[in-house]
């Protein structure tokens, strides 16, 4: 495989017929013989009652996943940051994206392969967005990417009133695919459903309004809901999940102007914090290059690799490009969650087996971890409510990283609650 390339394959599990293939970083398509070999080894293992999930070669990692004994997804990646965790999350996201757009019934009960292939084309833009580097982390964390905007109380009140007038309880205001404010019922959807809805809206071509049928993978995988979206200003959309009523025209002509025109300036201000994810007034240590903050209760996150955008605009010799920062922070998150901060279910059991052998011998788990390289330092901290991952300049003293992390947590719990 070419360096930094990814291939995603979707096949009908029973027949092995390819339904689609998507790729990143390569102009070549996989040959039928390669596709057949990848699917064949998985089917052979399954027939021997062996669950084949992943393998790796010198420069490539492969992962398999079967869903409902109907759809098989295979991903091959030669990216340096590819891991078992990231590839499994990718396969989960891809299947749930398919459910979101065409529903579970057509995927579980495949009656016409050619028609299914045609229907799945509607998923391509959303699926492709999971293969690309973005300014979001929800695909990996399974949390909702958010921004802390100015005038949040005003926007929240406006959204609540607008959603109620649209005969719904599920409403959301997003900037660049990140949630600014949402109604209480919107937050009751699963975090993966909210993440998928945000990524769907961000992946679609800009439009003043849309009436889009969606299936909620966990809440309503077989019965569609209507997703109404309206572009308030370029880059800022308001979304409503509803039933047969009201009509798109009624909401667009009667409600949008009534509720959102008076708050035009606060809406535009959302764009100023979109890249950093929070206002410039949030105090951050000058050594921080990027951060990922996760609220464990709400399953929402703040993410940026432009912690000091105004300062960096004046520099032309950045030691780490934004793409390198994203890759470093994603890799550190994967390392920490796989080895030191395993996710926990409500019953207290780990959802991810720890890859570090010493974990199984102790009753406690790590609450802090760090890595050091020639180009950057990374620090992770786990508290009762939050997970924090920092990307720091290499010249930041190692002994000061804990203090920097504590001050960062304090800033987002006291001055700017998240």
Curated annotation (Swiss-Prot):
Query: Where is this protein chiefly located?
Result: cytoplasm
Compartment(s) of residence: Cytoplasm; Cytoplasm, Cytoskeleton; Cytoplasm, Cytoskeleton, Cilium basal body
One of the record's GO cellular component terms: cell projection
- Origin, by domain of life? Eukaryota
Q: Biological process GO annotation list?
A: cilium assembly; embryonic body morphogenesis; embryonic skeletal system morphogenesis; establishment of planar polarity; neural tube closure; protein transport; regulation of smoothened signaling pathway; vesicle-mediated transport
What are the entry keywords? Answer: Cell projection, Cilium biogenesis/degradation, Cytoplasm, Cytoskeleton, Developmental protein, Protein transport, Transport
Entry keyword 4Fe-4S: no
Where would you find the membrane-spanning parts of this chain? none
Assembly with partners or alone: Interacts with rsg1. Interacts with intu and wdpcp; fuz, intu and wdpcp probably form the core CPLANE (ciliogenesis and planar polarity effectors) complex.
Job of this protein: Probable planar cell polarity effector involved in cilium biogenesis. Proposed to function as core component of the CPLANE (ciliogenesis and planar polarity effectors) complex involved in the recruitment of peripheral IFT-A proteins to basal bodies. May regulate protein and membrane transport to the cilium. May control the organization of the apical actin cytoskeleton, which is essential for the normal orientation of elongating ciliary microtubules.
Other comments on record = Knockdown of fy disrupted Hedgehog signaling and caused defects in neural tube closure, including exencephaly, spina bifida, and holoprosencephaly-like features.
Q: Which family does it belong to?
A: Belongs to the fuzzy family.
What's the protein here called? Protein fuzzy homolog
């Amino acid at each position: 495989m070419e360096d930094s390339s990814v291939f995603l394959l979707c096949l009908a599990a029973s027949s092995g017929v390819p339904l689609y293939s998507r790729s990143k970083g390569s102009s070549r398509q996989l040959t039928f013989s390669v596709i057949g070999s990848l699917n064949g080894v998985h089917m052979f293992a399954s027939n021997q009652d062996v669950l084949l999930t992943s393998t790796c070669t010198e420069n490539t990692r492969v992962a398999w996943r079967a869903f409902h004994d109907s759809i098989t997804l295979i991903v091959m990646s030669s990216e340096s940051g590819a891991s078992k965790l990231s590839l499994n999350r990718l396969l989960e996201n891809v299947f749930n994206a398919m459910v979101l757009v065409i529903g579970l019934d057509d995927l579980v009960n495949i009656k016409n392969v050619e028609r299914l292939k045609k229907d799945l084309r509607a998923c391509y833009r959303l699926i492709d967005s999971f293969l690309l580097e973005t300014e979001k982390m929800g695909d990996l964390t399974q949390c909702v990417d958010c921004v802390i905007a100015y005038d949040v109380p005003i926007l929240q009140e406006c959204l609540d009133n607008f959603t109620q007038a649209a005969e719904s309880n599920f409403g959301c205001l997003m900037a660049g695919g990140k949630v600014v404010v949402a109604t209480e019922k919107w937050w009751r959807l699963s975090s993966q459903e909210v993440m998928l809805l945000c990524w769907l809206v961000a992946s679609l071509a800009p439009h003043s309004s849309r009436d889009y049928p969606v299936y909620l993978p966990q809440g309503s995988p077989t019965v569609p809901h209507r997703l109404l979206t309206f572009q308030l200003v370029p880059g800022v959309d308001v979304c409503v999940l509803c039933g047969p009523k009201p009509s798109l025209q009624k909401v667009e002509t009667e409600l949008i102007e009534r509720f959102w025109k008076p708050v035009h300036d606060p809406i535009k201000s959302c764009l100023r914090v979109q890249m950093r994810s929070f206002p410039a007034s949030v105090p951050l240590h000058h050594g921080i290059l990027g951060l990922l903050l996760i609220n464990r209760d709400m399953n929402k996150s703040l993410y940026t690799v432009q912690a000091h955008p105004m300062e960096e605009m004046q520099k032309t010799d950045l030691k780490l490009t934004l793409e390198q920062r994203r890759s470093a922070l994603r890799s550190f998150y994967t390392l920490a969650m796989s080895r030191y901060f395993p996710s926990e279910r409500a019953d207290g059991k780990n959802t991810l087996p720890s890859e570090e052998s010493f974990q199984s011998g102790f009753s406690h788990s790590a609450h802090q971890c760090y890595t050091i390289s020639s180009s950057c330092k990374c620090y992770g901290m786990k508290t009762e409510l939050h997970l924090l991952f920092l990307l720091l300049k290499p010249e930041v003293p190692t002994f000061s990283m804990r203090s920097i992390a504590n001050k960062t947590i304090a800033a987002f719990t006291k001055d700017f609650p998240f």
